[in-house]
Amino acid sequence: SNLLVNATVNPDFGQVEADPSELNLSAFETFFEERRPFFVEGKGLFTFTVNCVVVVDCNTGEGLFYSRRIGRAPQLSDTYGDAASPAATKILGAAKLTGRLPNGFSIGVLDAVTDHVNGPGQTTLEPATNFAVVRGNQDFRGGEGSVGFIVTGVNRSLDPSSEPYLHRSAY
């Protein structure tokens, strides 16, 4: 087997190139390319795109799992934040198992935990959150065909100020 385990504790992605400026006036999220080294390595294993041709641009990473949501700007900054509010959520740690077994089965498991972020008056801008994804793919006939699955999960530690705005969990 060819399995690799990676872990990071309190990562600093300050050396990563910044995203281009963009003004998005739509109701839809802007998808940027992942550039953080921990998430770039082995990211192909976590790709599970849906409707690649008509609706979704599959080069952006948009699909069932989008790693840029891990460590993003606090979600409740618009509700409770001010100019001094943090621009990103701190990633406390993450671990990843990726690889391919001799029988053609590829596996990717990722788990990441982000810190709780307070705003003015100690209101929650982003609760402590756990992100998880498991992806498996079995190749057939030397890679001519495949069958795969993906399971994603988000679990948040909500408090009274964040509970009306965010889901406790999503799978």
Regions found by a protein language model. Give the residues of each.
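Outer membrane beta-barrel
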Residues: L3-I70, K90, A94-I107
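Signature for the C-terminal beta-barrel architecture of outer-membrane proteins
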Residues: V54-Y171
